[in-house]
Amino acid sequence: MDKKKLSESDICDKFIRPAMEQAGWHGMDQIYREFPLRAGRMVVRGNKAQRDKSTVLFADYVLCLKPNIPLAVVEAKDNQHAIGAGMTQAVNYAQLLDVPFSFASNGDGFVFRDATLANGVLEQNLTAARTQQSLLAEALVKNES
């Protein structure tokens, strides 16, 4: 299978989600796909109002500690992009959710950003997704210092 020919959605389904599940994240209550971040702008015309669907904002994935307690954002890109091409978007989404951890991936690996700087490194390349326990440990290290 040529990854370069796969869509972003295919990369999510075939590579990114399985990597997160392999790292111990539970698909039913910890991995949320197309997580809504902002409902979008309301457009009013006369007596009618509706949301402008083009302004609705979704994260590709949000990893949650428990339901509705987000811990990290994962932004996916198709394999024609670099691994970290979605990092700026992931960081912006993480700021909206007020979470310290961001990932970007094109299915070949992950770029991980730790805004807590718990281990003194802001961004690093990873071959696999981080576990929930490792993210919690970094968050706790930062809170203790």
Task: Indicate residue ranges for each PLM-predicted region.
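ATP-dependent helicase/translocase motor core
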Residues: 1-145
